[in-house]
Amino acid sequence: MVAKNIKYNEEARKKIQKGVKTLAEAVKVTLGPKGRHVVIDKSFGSPQVTKDGVTVAKEVELADKHENMGAQMVKEVASKTADKAGDGTTTATVLAEAIYTEGLRNVTAGANPMDLKRGIDKAVKVVVDQVKKISKPVQHHKEIAQVATISANNDAEIGNLIAEAMEKVGKNGSITVEEAKGFETVLDVVEGMNFNRGYLSSYFATNPETQECVLEDALVLIYDKKISGIKDFLPVLQQVAESGRPLLIIAEDIEGEALATLVVNRIRGGFRVCAVKAPGFGDRRKAMLEDIAILTGGQLISEELGMKLENANLAMLGKAKKVIVSKEDTTIVEGMGEKEALEARCESIKKQIEDSSSDYDKEKLQERLAKLSGGVAVIRVGAATEIEMKEKKDRVDDAQHATIAAVEEGILPGGGTALIRCIPTLEAFLPMLTNEDEQIGARIVLKALSAPLKQIAANAGKEGAIIFQQVMSRSANEGYDALRDAYTDMLEAGILDPAKVTRSALESAASVAGLLLTTEALIAEIPEEKPAAAPAMPGAGMDY
């Protein structure tokens, strides 16, 4: 077993403090509209330029193992806030440092760390309840654009694109961010259900120019096994041909005689048909086929349910107003399924998202929900250079998450103002704490609430304490607009923060800072000293 180096008491706390401070100093320079960029060296390719707190935090690794423990714990604050709310990672880091620094001062002065933590937790609950009270729901397209603009470092173009995307796909819709090939940042919206499986033969294409197969008022056959022979398949094909409507076939695969028959039918000018492979794999494929069946009002023909392809009839087929199939993907527009069944399916998927512990599963479930309920919007980020594109993509990601958080839990006056407005409520709560050290813990949170505002002011070249006093003396929604160096009504000026982001930042910061305050010993491996390399043998160069 490797020997360990153990630090205790004051020495341990100083090491943690140094690690916390080192990480926080790198992260907090990015806060606010006048926050700076951080350039991160990469082992390959060009350096990364970012203003995203969690991206900076993830890159910090300190040489001293004990200091690194403190840094890694605060890194956890940024990561947890990003996981919960998708934004607010810099605010969370600033709050964590403020709570820990002030808490450490009191522990050194003799306060009981466990009582301090209890006081911190109680104070945070009071502030979170107040944040929920003062938040207001997002009601207009304009407010979504304002939240996105603030989160994208005051880039109105990004804000408007995200608001437009949210409006088009709805709150259950999916917004994905990709890199564009050109300089422009554009929005593409795919209406209806889209999945990345194209036609199995180019002979199915109805438009030679676009190489797409477009089926109007189509029937949809959904089967969960391979179709290779024509015998089992023929009865339903004859019924469809008699109906005179085009047919989309979705199956695990269509090959051999079955595919050849369909292709020959198209070449000879028979009824319009197109065959595609089913999307997804394994259990996820079955779930997606069931989604398509509900969307189109058809049935999934599955042998597991005792159904056979040879017994399929028109009543089992789904219906859609339009189907567009390209070489790469398929889009079903206006499926004619029952509204109640569709809503029930969406609710079932939402429940699965809540119950799932895997980020990957959640993402896939969210995609399914979006395809069923709203549609998919793709924001393609363009820029002059790759470095600029990556930095812009980070900001679009932040803005997207901020808008989703705003829709979920409402909005607050931004620029650190909302936390300042919680100070009077917390002051009124202090006398209710009878334990002196718990009261000190609550006061630590009270002092920390002004830290984000002070940091925004400092990054704008102003004295944080003076700005704080000015904001405290003003009415509810008035705060400091660092971009214009003015005091204004933050809601009217469109300087908004999502309530979920503010809440998550405070909860994550207090949780980790409280744990650090109650730490009394640090254990780390002693780094092995590698022996110096042996000197080269004389004359080894053979130059004599």
Swiss-Prot record:
Reaction(s) this enzyme catalyzes, per UniProt: ATP + H2O + a folded polypeptide = ADP + phosphate + an unfolded polypeptide
Entry's EC annotation: 5.6.1.7
Residues at which ATP binds: 30-33, 51, 87-91, 415, 481-483, 497
Subcellular location: Cytoplasm
Top-level taxon in the UniProt lineage: Bacteria
One Gene Ontology cellular component annotation held by this UniProt entry: cytoplasm
Keyword Cytoplasm among record annotations: yes
Pfam families: Cpn60_TCP1
Top-level EC class as recorded in UniProt: isomerase
GO molecular function: ATP binding; ATP-dependent protein folding chaperone; isomerase activity; unfolded protein binding
GO process terms (BP): protein refolding
This protein's UniProt keywords: ATP-binding, Chaperone, Cytoplasm, Isomerase, Nucleotide-binding
Subunit structure: Forms a cylinder of 14 subunits composed of two heptameric rings stacked back-to-back. Interacts with the co-chaperonin GroES.
Role summary: Together with its co-chaperonin GroES, plays an essential role in assisting protein folding. The GroEL-GroES system forms a nano-cage that allows encapsulation of the non-native substrate proteins and provides a physical environment optimized to promote and accelerate protein folding.
Similarity comment: Belongs to the chaperonin (HSP60) family.
Name this protein carries in UniProt: Chaperonin GroEL
Lineage: Bacteria, Pseudomonadati, Chlamydiota, Chlamydiia, Chlamydiales
Underlying gene: groEL
